[in-house]
Amino acid sequence: MRRPKISLKKYFYLTLICALLLIFGFSLKEREIWKTLSPRSSQITTQQQQHQHLHQLQSMDEEHPMATSSTPPPIAATLLPEVADNLVEEPEQTVLEEEESEADRLQEPPAEKAWFFKNGEYYPKPAKTYSNRKARKRHAPRLLPHQDPYSDRIINQLMYVPHNYEEIKSSGKLKTILLYNGLGPWNVKKGRDVFLKAKCPVDTCELTANRDLASTADMILYKDHYIPTGIRRPSNSKQVSMLYYLECPYHTQNVKVPDAINWTATYRRDSTIVAPYEKWQYYDTKVQQQEQDINYSVNKTKKVAWFVSNCGARNGRLQYAHELQKYIEVDIYGACGNFKCSRSTADKCFEILDNDYKFYLAFENSNCKDYITEKFFVNALNRRVLPIVMGARPEDYEVSAPRRSYIHVDEFSSPKELAEYLRILDHDDELYNSYFKWKGTGEFINTYYWCRVCATLHNEEQLRKPRWYTDLNDWWRGPGVCTTRSWRNFKARKDVISDSSDD
């Protein structure tokens, strides 16, 4: 029997298929052998890759340094040496070290507290310099409102030190701040005393009340009342004119002079130097609530208290309280109510508040943007009572107060609806106590006003590009800044500060 003939073409295809099968089989065998080897070889390769990556990061840092305290992070308690330095100084980690248990990580020492906290010891370092224009802009310290409009920038200012600060100190040159209304209204001494006693990170400033220095001072600072100097200032002048207001627009001066003021210092968050009545700062912004060992409602038999002496406030707070009284017990102490508690025995009054009452009316005398005073921070949050607030907008309390630490009247359509919710809280200890979980997660810090003024005055980059309030009066008391009614339907005012630069 004759064998069938196979063409050369078929031989080629058969050979190709056999070769592919052999290659596939060899690949499978090699993979099995690789798996049986010690993991040490792969670990060494991983370490080599990590070392190469670390070397690349170090090279990048040398070419483009990372930002330091010139742009501090929002968490004050974690303001530690910059990431770039950590990358250089930390020893190489093995794969086993990277797989360290979570329990071991939790045993690491806590981050060092920044200097403005109680017992805080960490002070900022001078900012780094950048030769590249884009890098300078990207890492510029966010000290002014246009650089960070969604923050009060207080922490940024507290942690700012100019890059050439050592040269400034060695030169002996000081920034002169002229208090045009005199030293008395500020209760300070001339010279550097206020900066040195506060241990400011930047203390190369001096105070004076000598108006003869009006043409040469680095800053002219007005308190509550603007007075024209009569000196014509060159257009390229780096001198700063700053106006300080403590009270709300209803009780402050009208300033109708255009382009007379380029910095402001008020309780408003869009001021150049924000000067709040109090400043709450978390130790760690990731930890804003924690369980409490205290039942804040225990043995409290009374509902709502209010200490008040001004019965004619223009926001209608007294009328609101009287309406609230129709639906829940409200004890009004002082000239506007039937209960008495003298200011001379304030401590005793607050003991009554702590021991007997569950709620406190922290009502401001005016409904103005960002206007939150000691009525809330001191009289309420420092006590063991839940504050009900009226004054600033709901969003202002959200960014200024500890999370879930109060109730805003504008969360409810009427005093009756508010009273219904207060009754729910009165009968639910767990829900009531949930409003106190913020306690222990941070503290009210000293904002060191003079330290921040001095530090910001050393930001030469921004002094070369001055900004002016074209209409300070409109910025301070324009539409949407204050209201005599509820905030629920208000319209935000336009931004009126001029911007001549192209940042």
Curated annotation (Swiss-Prot):
UniProt topological domain (Lumenal) ranges: 29-503
Positions with biased composition (Low complexity): 47-58
Pathway: Protein modification; protein glycosylation
Annotated region (Disordered), positions in chain: 44-71
Cytoplasmic side: 1-10
Record's bilayer topology term: Single-pass type II membrane protein
Any Pfam family: Glyco_transf_10
Residue intervals passing through the bilayer: 11-28
Record keywords, A-Z: Glycoprotein, Glycosyltransferase, Golgi apparatus, Membrane, Signal-anchor, Transferase, Transmembrane, Transmembrane helix
Keyword Calcium (UniProt): no
Cofactor: Mn(2+)
Location(s), subcellular: Golgi apparatus, Golgi stack membrane
Annotated EC: 2.4.1.214
Major place of residence: Golgi
Domain of life the protein comes from: Eukaryota
Enzymatic reactions: N(4)-{beta-D-GlcNAc-(1->2)-alpha-D-Man-(1->3)-[beta-D-GlcNAc-(1->2)-alpha-D-Man-(1->6)]-beta-D-Man-(1->4)-beta-D-GlcNAc-(1->4)-beta-D-GlcNAc}-L-asparaginyl-[protein] + GDP-beta-L-fucose = N(4)-{beta-D-GlcNAc-(1->2)-alpha-D-Man-(1->3)-[beta-D-GlcNAc-(1->2)-alpha-D-Man-(1->6)]-beta-D-Man-(1->4)-beta-D-GlcNAc-(1->4)-[alpha-L-Fuc(1->3)]-beta-D-GlcNAc}-L-asparaginyl-[protein] + GDP + H(+)
Keyword hit for Membrane: yes
GO MF assignments: alpha-(1->3)-fucosyltransferase activity; glycoprotein 3-alpha-L-fucosyltransferase activity
Signal peptide residues on this chain, from the entry's feature table: none
GO cellular component: Golgi cisterna membrane; Golgi medial cisterna
GO biological process: fucosylation; N-glycan fucosylation; nervous system development; protein glycosylation; protein N-linked glycosylation via asparagine
Disruption phenotype: Defective alpha-1,3-fucosylation activity and a significantly lower longitudinal length-to-width ratio of the ventral nerve cord (VNC).
Sites carrying sugar chains: N262, N295, N299
Family note: Belongs to the glycosyltransferase 10 family.
Function: Catalyzes alpha-1,3 glycosidic linkages of N-glycans. Plays a role in neuronal development by promoting ventral nerve cord formation, possibly by promoting interactions between migrating cells and the extracellular matrix or by promoting neural activity.
Protein name: Glycoprotein 3-alpha-L-fucosyltransferase A
Source organism per UniProt: Drosophila melanogaster
